[in-house]
Design a protein with these regions (language model features):
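Membrane-helix boundary/helix-loop-helix interface segments in multi-pass membrane proteins
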Residues: 2-40, 46-197, 358-373
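Hydrophobic alpha-helical transmembrane segments
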Residues: 72-77, 307-327
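Transmembrane alpha-helix boundary/anchor motif
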Residues: 79, 87, 143, 242, ...
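Hydrophobic alpha-helical segments of polytopic membrane proteins
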Residues: 97-98, 104, 179-239
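Hydrophobic, glycine- and aromatic-enriched re-entrant/interface helices and adjoining loop segments
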Residues: 116, 120-122, 224-316, 335-339
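Alpha-helical transmembrane segments of multi-pass membrane proteins, especially transporters
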Residues: 134, 170-174, 178, 205, ...
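Hydrophobic alpha-helical segments of membrane proteins
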Residues: 195, 203, 279, 314-318, ...
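Loop-to-helix entry and N-terminal half of a specific, functionally important transmembrane alpha helix
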Residues: 331-369
């Protein structure tokens, strides 16, 4: 019995990526992904300038204020991406464990700062501001990937009730090693985000972790059942948020009645509707002239729809879909399961942010404060 058990474990716990070849740093697939990213970044700069030059001039005295900020952030992001490409994945696996405790301390420290609009989400040091939930998202991607990839993989094995030893192993691996242990570190993070409160951060972080587990087969059908149960519990969860004032205000403004909508959502729908098929033309938006709040960040997609119309909106959505699809292909070609899960997690964050932002702008879901990547 013990010999058969060892043979089963040796045979069934080896990870084999769905696509067997590592794409390498300069493969055609990686170059195509970087080209798509460059197109999205260039498109974003053009649209940000169009949406922000009036606001920048009137509020900051510089029509290029927001463009300068964005270019600086892009340069920092590209530098970090280039630096991370030289970091060995074994170092990331080691570093994600102590970094988890640092992230918890950062989230707790956020609660000590004065609230802004009823929420404590930022650490302010001098002129610098850091939203700790963004750091927490990346840390949870690394830690979830580490814990889930450390669990044994059981391949296509399906236990029989007569094989009690193998059934016990199957349940332990599927439930404890592949679901509970990877998800357990998420609980303290969610508790601290609730205390801020930061519900959009909770939704995104949970969705990212769930996507990693589902797309890599962790937990098998049990993970999909858990996701279905979470979807069924969504409405009771929305009922519970009535105790949180600002969340209830956002839910109250989410309505099919145009007169009941808040000014931000109403102006967003006006911008989308006035764009039509081809739009008013680049730079010709009316709503960006201080009519549409947050036209330079959360609601910039409305300006895209107004100036470039339905065609422009579809174009940017297709570009994001292409970026995510190429990223997933790179992830599935990674040399080990940890790298695959990290790649899936990063693409999941982009995908969920795009979905939530466009859904908010079109009044499909309540306002979450999630920006377009």
């Amino acid at each position: 019995m013990e010999a058969a058990r060892r043979q089963y474990r040796q045979k069934e716990t080896t990870w084999a990526p769905p696509l067997q070849r590592d794409p390498g740093p300069w493969s055609r697939l990686v170059i195509n992904w970087m080209a798509t990213l460059a197109v999205i970044m260039a498109f974003g700069l053009v649209m940000l300038y169009s949406a922000s030059y009036t606001t920048g001039y009137l509020r900051m005295g510089d029509s290029l204020h927001y463009i300068k900020q964005q270019i600086l952030c892009m340069a920092i992001g590209i530098g970090c991406m280039a630096a991370m490409s030289y970091v060995d994945h074994r170092f990331l696996r080691w570093a994600c464990k102590p970094c988890y405790w640092i992230v918890l301390l950062m989230l707790a420290a956020t609660l000590a700062f004065p609230p802004l609009n009823g929420c404590r989400r930022w650490i302010r040091l001098g002129g610098l501001t850091l939203q700790t939930s963004e750091v927490a998202k990346f840390e949870m991607i690394l830690l979830t990937a580490h814990l889930a990839s450390s669990a044994p993989q059981i391949g296509r094995f399906r236990p029989s009730l007569k094989e009690k030893v193998r059934l016990k192993d199957w349940l332990f691996i599927r439930i404890v090693r592949q679901i509970i242990l990877p998800v357990l570190p998420l609980v303290p993070v969610l508790v601290l985000l609730i205390m801020e409160p930061h519900m959009s951060g909770i939704l995104l972080t949970t969705a990212i972790v769930g996507t990693i587990l589902m797309l890599t087969g962790c937990g098998g059908v049990l993970t999909w059942c858990g996701a279905a149960a979470a979807a069924l519990l969504l409405k009771p969860a929305l009922t519970l948020v009535e105790s949180i004032g600002y969340l209830q205000d956002r839910l109250n403004t989410w309505s099919d009645d145009l007169e009941a909508l808040n000014d931000q959502t109403k102006q967003s729908l006006y911008a989308i509707g006035s764009g039509g098929l081809k739009g008013l033309g680049l730079g010709n938006s009316v709503e960006k002239q201080l009519w549409l709040p947050e036209s330079t960040n959360d609601f910039i997609f409305s300006v895209v729809c107004e100036e470039l119309g339905f065609i422009g909106a579809v174009l940017i959505i297709v570009l994001f879909i292409l970026l995510i699809a190429q990223g997933l292909m790179i992830a599935y070609k990674a040399e080990n399961q940890f790298c695959t899960m990290v790649g899936i997690g990063i693409m999941a964050q982009i995908a969920w942010q795009v979905f939530c932002n466009i859904a908010v702008v079109t009044n499909t879901i309540p306002n979450t404060g999630i920006s377009l990547p």
